[in-house]
């Protein structure tokens, strides 16, 4: 179309569906179509148009306007002939490339634009008349056939000879300098039915349009007609703009003679799709103009500013929760902003039609910069005339959805390539969204009930629809939109250039995007599924959009020339009218019709060469695999032979007689599609066996023969290269699994390079190759031969196994519960890829499993499964995969291969079994064990363990790290520390990387410490991810160790001297390495960017470990706790990690997920159990679990407290999970007793109680206006049940523990008890938001359950209050100092024999341990230190330890009246002393210890006040200096400068 000079740039670009670049043109001063003239490829690139197809469409539009403008009769330049360039300056001939839209013509310096010929528009250039299709062949005059044809000289394109109506042309140079003529005879062609227009291939391929034809009306005379057609074509484009949105339909120049005169005007727009059109769908990411941290006012109205990272890219203002978040929390488009204005206190307002956004900057200059930038963009927008507010787009689907992690429902709008989320439909109309999710690279996963997940590379979005049908509709629409982002319409546009191919050959649906290659038909998606059911021997189905890599130019040409109309004349020539298939047909009739049409051939006429239909199908399948595809297919599908007419053939490329195509000796172009990989060579083929075994032997009687193998339609094995008949063959459908055999232990006897094929029926055959290259080539070829296309790109080096698998996973929704999904598994390295493949069952979604990050690999025996087949269970974080093979033989092979790939065995850091944080499990396990049990051990990492045990433990970790469980009673701290140091020392490459050692030393030589630390950060950033994460974990652990230097005597200098030889793998005498490691430990906070919350968490865990002995803390800083389910039994116990931010709701969901418990009608509530089950407190879903557990250390018996999950009826506890509040206050008559007794006495009395707000009121009468007593509920705890010793009047009561008293309230029935309890809980947490039942927490995906793979610290959202409360608790514990008496230290030592070998001298200074470590009390006795160390109590369970020797004395001070039990001898190895001596010594120790504790308790009770009792401290009975437990007698060691000094 012609582009007027003043035509708006947006309207001009809309003609080619590229209006999204209008703002880009306007920003560069190109507001009209006339201003865009003169642009080229480079200029468009500089504008930011990166998509090649988009640039070509704009250039084509510019070229069209230039041609029509140059031929304008009002233009003087159009009347003058343009001089032809000299022969020596003629541009080079373009070389055609497959599926290239335009070929840029380069030449001497001219003013032409890319794609235009220098002779274009000259009067001396002419072209041949194009024959019009007509029903009967009419004789053409000799004058027309022999007329000289003038055109632009083009390079002959033999690939597209079927479209060349002239053949090769001989160029003849004329003496006139302004013309060049090329003449060639035009052979008479078989006319078509109007579906294909024979065009010049140069015109179609390069977009060059020849002008000026002898015998045709003059261009200037027909200008009015062309203009009318162009205007009508534009209107048609406007009407079909939405239907063709996204497709690059390149228009041909407005030459009316190119179009068939038999076509009507309304059909013109349908023929504008070129066979060589292109499609590009790329979104250009804008560069932010402004970005930074700002404070944003919360919309809740409580005047709270939230820290947000804000970006402005010229089109929209986005704010994020963090600068690393991929998705924003809100998007404000520029078109929705009315104005911006600044206000006081460094704030500025962004005003929209719906809301005013308030941001606060750090300075006035920053505020002015934001305001001026936004205001200038607003002015530019108004000058350019953008609508405000913007017109909402027409999305594919809209509706309200629930988003996990979002309080209210969101309004979702699905557009091509993007899913937009808005707060409401009004926000959608204004364009103010939450975030916009690009669908490229995403996947859709349907979950339970009404939920589905959208998996992006950065985050998982979990949605819940209103119903199951809406869920399916959303999932289908999203899946189609995701597939659309992967589509390439280049091949489809070419094939659709034939109008007959724009409708399905079977049902008539529009825009079919599939094709049956051997049948020559283009079909829709629904029919393609039925074609695939026919089998590859009948219909070979390929996608036009997804399988573009296998579409050769010859196949594309075949479909353009043939067309669905010609193919249907062959396949449905005898089909009665009205009996065809309709687009809305159901799968049943559709499949029956397609089977009758193609499998049986009921609707075609008899073929002259193949009377048998099965022979015809075999010939069609063979034709696409042989050379001369076009010739063979057109001969087989020759409908004219049935009608008694002369057969039609495409013209020959040399202009000879049609149908006489020369034979092409080259291999067929379509071999890569039908026969995916053709390969041949010699293989050592063993006979087929029914038993799995090693690779075939190379010598001896059982050595396999060397056969010539050819991989084509089947794997054929010949005796020699020249043998005519194969000895045996294998069909691709017979192969179940391909496996690369592991190298044998003795390569001399067997083939070191071999692979195996497991066949159907439980058979296996081995093949040996001559080398590694041959093995890789054969496995890749065979893998491509029998596997689906989705597996091909994954084949390559490192392939271990490939074959069919059945998959079942709770995360993948199947049509019915327990239904297995069919797919292909590909094992490569340590990754298992699951690919979708057609099969008898529903296809499995594509997925990937990192085997070295698995938590568990197990096999379920056939006796324990309902289908009586073995299942392989892969437990990953957050999900469990069940795999099943086709038979027992391939399942055994898969089990061995996956187990071997998931194991370790290597000495490289990357070869270890990893945790979720990419940290080797051995490092995580050792650090966790030392953190839990060794921080208080004096000389930790300095004292060595038994070398034999350390080597054995390291070998176990390398063999299978996830199966190693470090337990205090079985493993010793010294052995674990030796194992950790040995692991780092024996790595192939040190964790700090040997290639970066010079940079480490260079950084250590810098004079300033700040410079050194910054340089260390740079070097750490250069490390691989696994090295970087492992080093950070190790340094963080050493930082915690040196924080306890007052107890373990291990300062930073000592740790650096010990670990430098292992971390850097040096001799240990290098001063630089020791200095680097020492400064890394000291500067851990700054070097690794540890925030304040994490620092407080580290301090908290160190305080807990050093004060509370029975706590277990992993190196990640989370508390490891035991949670029971329904009953306090060992089998019902689950161990997991509890972070400071974990709520009771999240804990419940995690435990139920770990146990695989399905949600029912009952609610699961977490209870805090005290008094061995007498008191149960239901935790509010929003309560922090760790904050409650920290208070157990104040109990007389901390081991009596635990966590328990119980099912509660919905009617009793349902109100805890809703936001509904009671309209009237809770009031009722209860029987009450308080302790200590004051007003109510020591008996249960009936009183009226009123719950008002956050206070519990005691009323004299029900209608009393003034209460007698009032108790605030802040900090109160309500427990179900009353201690039995108080003899409650009813079994239904609850205990309210206040700050200085206990209140016991008895109810009439259980419902009343639950009503009061839940009302008190809701009153205490009335400011919390209502929770969602059985919804995963926001940190479920990032938090790992406790096993042998702990995680790095997980930072919560609001851990400040939790940490503050925990620190306050710890301060009180430090002041009281009672923990050391209640929790004796557990020590882990070797056996008696090993201690004799490695006996160390007794230290002169006392070894300070907690009270209960008996060596302190008998330091002056004659018993040796090594003997008394064996008597330390070792509880079996760290959290629920048994009664130790000091617990009878604790029961005396208990207020709960626990009975005393006689002391039991502690378990442990036998000592050298006699039993009588040891028994008398124990009795003496117990008596002395009890007298000391009782005397100290009486003394402190007499001196201290009742409100603030002081904690007892045990004096030294032997005259040693009194020492507070946990503190040394001398200050910790300090760093010494010389590196050669021994350890202090």
Swiss-Prot record:
The gene is ARAP3. Interacts (via SAM domain) with INPPL1/SHIP2. Phosphatidylinositol 3,4,5-trisphosphate-dependent GTPase-activating protein that modulates actin cytoskeleton remodeling by regulating ARF and RHO family members. Is activated by phosphatidylinositol 3,4,5-trisphosphate (PtdIns(3,4,5)P3) binding. Can be activated by phosphatidylinositol 3,4-bisphosphate (PtdIns(3,4,5)P2) binding, albeit with lower efficiency. Acts on ARF6, RAC1, RHOA and CDC42. Plays a role in the internalization of anthrax toxin. One of its GO terms (cellular component) is lamellipodium. It is found in: Cytoplasm; Cytoplasm, Cytoskeleton; Cell membrane; Cell projection, Lamellipodium. Residues 907-1088 form the Rho-GAP domain. The lineage of its organism: Eukaryota, Metazoa, Chordata, Craniata, Vertebrata. Residues 1482-1492, 1502-1527 have a biased composition (Low complexity). Residues 287-379, 394-483, 1223-1325 form the PH domain. Residues 4-68 form the SAM domain. The record marks 942 as: Arginine finger. Residues 82-97, 130-139 have a biased composition (Pro residues). CDD domains: ArfGap_ARAP3 (cd17902), PH1_ARAP (cd13253), PH2_ARAP (cd13254), PH3_ARAP (cd13256), PH5_ARAP (cd13259), RhoGAP_ARAP (cd04385), SAM_Arap1_2_3 (cd09490). This is Arf-GAP with Rho-GAP domain, ANK repeat and PH domain-containing protein 3. The modification Phosphothreonine is found at residue 1348. InterPro entries: Arf-Rho-GAP_ANK-PH_domain, ARFGAP/RecO, ArfGAP_dom, ArfGAP_dom_sf, PH-like_dom_sf, PH_domain, RA_dom, Rho_GTPase_activation_prot. It comes from the Eukaryota. Changing residue 1428 to P: In a breast cancer sample; somatic mutation. It is a peripheral membrane protein. The keyword S-adenosyl-L-methionine does not apply. The modification Phosphoserine is found at residues 1444, 1480. Residues 1438-1457 have a biased composition (Polar residues). PANTHER family: ARF-GAP WITH RHO-GAP DOMAIN, ANK REPEAT AND PH DOMAIN-CONTAINING PROTEIN 3, RHO GTPASE ACTIVATING PROTEIN AT 15B, ISOFORM C. The modification Phosphotyrosine is found at residues 1403, 1408. GO terms for biological process: cytoskeleton organization; regulation of actin cytoskeleton organization; signal transduction; vesicle-mediated transport. It comes from Homo sapiens. Residues 1117-1210 form the Ras-associating domain. Tyrosine phosphorylated at a low basal level. PDGF treatment stimulates phosphorylation. Tyrosine phosphorylation is increased in cells that are in the process of becoming attached to a substrate and that start spreading and flattening.
